[in-house]
């Protein structure tokens, strides 16, 4: 271990990474550089600086970076162009944040001359894979330290005992227990552990922190509009906004109306199933709006092909392959499809739902003249359908004739 002189730690200031900070100092006898990413998690981050200083990290080795705009612009929005949902439901709020954190970890390692980077992901979860695949893709020779795979602290009980033995404060929630395992950023908040580990038990309402209970949401619906240019949201209710500002505003609306709650049992990349509770208020509104604008601007063939590619694209992000050539290849195709995804979507927000109720676009492929039930003035000859059906039925008739 003597070859490790300096480590950059992805540091939240919470219990796990505070224990890791002390453990790195004790075990590796090395300098530790802390990096705390502001991804819009809604927490005051200066306490992380104070705690790092208290544990012996000098000011010039404490990095707290505001990455909110980069996060939404370069990671969330490209993913949303693909309509990505892992296993049909999960909007990938944790998964999509990991490559950006890894990217900045590697940048800081280069800036400070560090020998290694470290993270607080456990050996059971997906995050260890996401952090490390991204790190190796960006810096093939980097050393990655994953304490949960090295030390003998095999449970949260053991972790808390170690923390108390080394005078590291252990936070308590309002119920007098150690907190749930949570992750938060501008896109979502996730909770795992304790009562959530039983997939039969309904999530207690006190676990939810980002949305009101839909039953308690306003009794009057609220209507909003989102403007899109080339597949990306650019304005809310006619007011131009940056990517992060737009998502934050949608989060406020989603919170108010109880939108974006998801109770999910998912298949982890490492092989086990896990149960998590996700709150993605603004992301759910945005995702539905993006689908809405695509519905009138994308050709059927392109739209259906995108839907076929989406599960693979979502799986690549979930599994940690953001920086892989296959993800970049799919992204190029997806981005090409968005060239004319322009226009405005109107949504109705009401008691947990975000419904598209209107859409318009200068690039609309919707032709009211062709689709009308009234006189179409010769736009469409219904007799043409007979030949279309006959040709498409040919193979079915031949199969039937052979008794197949």
UniProtKB/Swiss-Prot annotation:
Stretches for region Disordered: 173-200
UniProt feature, compositional bias: Polar residues: 179-192
Organism field: Novosphingobium aromaticivorans (strain ATCC 700278 / DSM 12444 / CCUG 56034 / CIP 105152 / NBRC 16084 / F199)
Binding site for ATP: 10-18, 37, 120
Biological or metabolic pathway of the protein: Amino-acid biosynthesis; L-arginine biosynthesis; L-arginine from L-ornithine and carbamoyl phosphate: step 2/3
UniProt key word Cytoplasm: yes
One GO location term (cellular component): cytoplasm
EC number(s) recorded for this UniProt protein: 6.3.4.5
Assembly with partners or alone: Homotetramer.
Annotated L-citrulline binding sites: 90, 95, 126, 130, 181, 190, 266, 278
HAMAP family listed in its UniProt record: Arg_succ_synth_type1
Pfam assignment, any one: Arginosuc_synth
Keywords: Amino-acid biosynthesis, Arginine biosynthesis, ATP-binding, Cytoplasm, Ligase, Nucleotide-binding
Domain of life per record: Bacteria
Class of enzymatic activity (EC top level): ligase
Name of the protein: Argininosuccinate synthase
Main location per the UniProt record: cytoplasm
The keyword Membrane appears for this protein: no
GO BP, one annotated term: argininosuccinate metabolic process
